[in-house]
Each structure stands twice: as structure tokens, then as C-alpha cells.
Amino acid sequence: MKKLFITIAAILLGASFASAQDLASVTETFNNGAIALQADNKAEALQSFREALAGAELLGAEGEEIASKCKSYIPVLEFSIAKEMVNNQDYDNAVAALKATIDLAKEYGDSATAESAADLIPQVLMQKANAALSAKDYEAAVAGYNAVLEADPNNGVAALRLGSALNSAGDKDAAIEAFKMAAANGQEKQAVKQISNIYLKNAAALLKAKDYANAVSEALKVNEYGENAKAYQIAAQASQSLKKNADAIKYFEKYLELAPNAGNATQIAYTVAALYQQQGNKAKAIEFYQKAITDPKFGAEAQKQINALK
């Protein structure tokens, strides 16, 4: 019986000694992580804390303190390493690391780090998309800005830049929809300007192609986003080509109202006068011929017509 007690005591002593050895080993691993962290070797520190955590959890109650400390360091280090990836423009790996950080931080009860990592993801996606746009890789830029908007649907800047990328890629209709989204999310001034420019360029191209009816239609869409002298000029020229002189007069007059000092104002006035003269409206014809008498090319003829109409 005495021999049995001695054997049991030896076993218990051995277990206690092994436990002490395990705790010492885990503590040493944790301390190695702390030393690496002080030396700003984040990857080595992270690995040490992970190993220390795994060992501490096997120790149960004895390892709780070290495990708790490891859990406080690991998400913060993951986040810091992810931010370094962002600085190195390693955007895809950065996003993956940030997502891993969020999961770990939530698991370990670090809500602040989880929130910070989540807030950073749209910014990283934006940087990636911006880099693609600057490189004129419009397909990648479009994908990038769509990813930003998936994470942050109310991001007006992302919608605005998505519109720019789509417009540069030649997808005008989709660009307009993106600009409308931007306008609804704080970027109205710039978005409206971009939409107006798209319609204006379309109108000019249609006028050049002699597609006069659609040129008028596109030009008038410009003015839905703010009156534009050039749009009225295109609408007027297209209407004149369609022999819709009343419309041409109306649009030319709006052009002169918005751009009274334009370089071609006297020439436009001469055209309006001639159109009124064709309609038999002498008073209006004289009014606009008088605005054209200073024109170097048409001034003499304008004066001649005034004299004839009086």
C-alpha cells in the first residue's frame, strides 16, 4: 500500500512539473512576441502571440491571463499589418486581411478594432478604383467603384467616379445613371455638370451627322439640368435644318439671351433677323438686323435690309 501511495504521488508531482513547464514555455513564447513587437517586427510578433494563445488555451485556467493578453494583441496586429498592405498598394490582400481582422476582433471581443477595420474597407476599395481610373483601366475602375458602392451604397464620390469611368469607357447611358446616383448623394453640382456634358456632346455629334431631330432632342435634355447657351445653339441650328423656323428662332433667341457677348452673337442675330423676315415679321427683322450691323461680315447687308424694310 505504501508503495502505491508513493507511485501516485510521483505521478501527481510529474503532472505538476509538466504543467509548470508548459506554462513557462507559453510565457516564453508570449514574451518573444512582446520583444518582436517592440522591435516593430509585426509579423513575427503576431505569429508568437498566435502560438502562445494556442498553448495557453490548452492549459485551461492556468493560461487564461496569457490567452487574454494574446487576444488583445492579435486583432490590433492584424489590423496594423493590413494597413501596411494598403500603404504598399497591395489592395486585394489588404481587403482580405481587413476582413480577417474583423472576424478575429469580433471573436475576441475587440469591437473598436472590428469597426475600424470595417470602416477602412470602402476606403481601400476606393483607392484601388482610383488607381485603375488614373491608369485608364476603365473596366477595372468600374468594377472597383461598384465594389465601393456595394460596401457603401451612399458614397456619392464613388458614384461620381463610377460615372466618369463608364463615360470614358463609352457606356454613356450607364454613366448618366451613375451620375444621377451621385447627385442624390451629395455630389449634385459635379454630377449635373457631367450629365449635361454627355448630352451636349451627343447633341453636337448628332448635328454633325445631320441627325437633326435627335440633335434637338439631346440638346434639350442638356437644358433639363440647367440652361446652356451651346445647347440652344445646337437645337436652333438643327431646327433650322429641319425647316422648323419658329423653333429655330426661339432657340437662337435663348442663345443670345444667355450669351449676349459671344463672338458669334452678331452673326446669330443676323440669322434670326433673316428668319423673322421670311415669316413677314418686319419689326422683329429690323430689331435683329440692328443687332447685326456691327458684324464685320454681315453688317453692311444688315443695314441694307433695315433700309429696305423701313
At which residue positions do the language-model features occur?
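N-terminal leader/linker segments that initiate helical-solenoid repeat arrays
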Residues: 2, 6, 13, 17-83, ...
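Canonical tetratricopeptide repeat
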Residues: 66, 73, 80, 117-120, ...
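Short coil turns that delineate tetratricopeptide repeat
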Residues: 57, 106, 153, 186-187, ...
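TPR alpha-solenoid repeat register
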Residues: 62, 110-111, 117, 158, ...
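Canonical positions in the second alpha-helix
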Residues: 52, 101, 147-148, 181-182, ...
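Register position in tetratricopeptide repeats
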Residues: 38, 76, 80, 87, ...
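TPR-repeat structural position
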Residues: 42-43, 91, 138, 172, ...
